Amino acid sequence: MLIQIADLFTPAEAAQIRARLEAADWVDGKVTAGYQSAQVKHNRQLSEQHPLAQELGGLILQRLAANNLFMSAALPRKIFPPLFNRYEGGEAFGYHVDNALRPVPGTAERVRTDLSATLFFSEPDSYDGGELVVDDTYGPRTVKLPAGHMVLYPGTSLHKVTPVTRGARISAFFWLQSLVREDSQRSLLLEMDVAIQRLNQDTPGHASIVQLTGVYHNLLRRWTDV
C-alpha cells in the first residue's frame, strides 16, 4: 500500500518551512543509518537535537493527528519524531530497507517501522532527480510530490532516492508503528473505512452502514496489536 496525502501543508507554509531549513546547519546523513544503509547513503540531515527539527517535528505531528486519511491509512500507535534531510550536488540514497526497530532518542521507547513516510518541502520543478523509488509487488513506483504533500509506504519496502543533479531536495521523513502491523490487513481496513464514509454520504442513515461499521471494528479488534 502506497498512499499519497495531499496538502498536509499549504504551498505557502511549505515555502516558509523550506526557507528556515535552508538556513539551518546540516550534518552527514549517515548518523541515522544502519550499517548496510550507510554504504549507500549520501545526503545531509538536520541533527535530531536541533531546536528547529524539534519545533517542525511537533508541527508535523499536529497536522498528522488532524488528517483523516493519515489516521485511517496508518492507524498509528507510535510515531518516530520526524527527521529532516537534504540532497543536492549528486547526493543520493541507494536501494535499502529501513531498520525494523528505531530507538527513540532520550527514551527507552522503540518504534517498529511498519510504515515509512516522506513529506516533501521542495517543489518538484526546483530540482532534477531526487525521486523516491519504492519497489512493491507491481514493480518500482516513482514518487516526486509537490511541496507540502506526503507519501506513506510499507517499512518492508526496498526503496531508494535517485541522485539530485540540480537544485536541492528538502524533506521530512519518519517511521511509525501501526496498531495493525500487516500491510494487507491495513489496506483492507482502509478500503472498508472509505466505503463506509461514501455510503454515509450517498445514503445517510442506511441500516447497512451500522452493520458494516460493526464488521470494521470487529476486524480491527481481531488484528490490533496493542
From Swiss-Prot:
A Pfam family reported for this protein in Swiss-Prot or TrEMBL: 2OG-FeII_Oxy_3
Gene3D superfamilies in the record: q2cbj1_9rhob like domain, Rabenosyn, Rab binding domain
PROSITE patterns to which the protein is assigned, alphabetical: FE2OG_OXY
Domain Fe2OG dioxygenase residues, every copy: 78-178
Binding sites annotated in the UniProt record for 2-oxoglutarate: R169
Domain of life: Bacteria
InterPro entries in alphabetical order: Oxoglu/Fe-dep_dioxygenase_dom, PKHD_C, PKHD_hydroxylase, Pro_4_hyd_alph, Pro_4_hyd_alph_FE2OG_OXY
Cofactor binding summary note: Binds 1 Fe(2+) ion per subunit.
GO molecular function: 2-oxoglutarate-dependent dioxygenase activity; iron ion binding; L-ascorbic acid binding
Protein's GO biological process: DNA damage response; intracellular iron ion homeostasis
Binding site for Fe cation: H96, D98, H159
Cofactor names: Fe(2+); L-ascorbate
Listed EC numbers: 1.14.11.-
Keywords, in A-Z order: Dioxygenase, Iron, Metal-binding, Oxidoreductase, Vitamin C
Coiled coil region boundaries: none
Protein name: PKHD-type hydroxylase BP3529
Organism (species): Bordetella pertussis (strain Tohama I / ATCC BAA-589 / NCTC 13251)
Top-level taxonomy: Bacteria, Pseudomonadati, Pseudomonadota, Betaproteobacteria, Burkholderiales
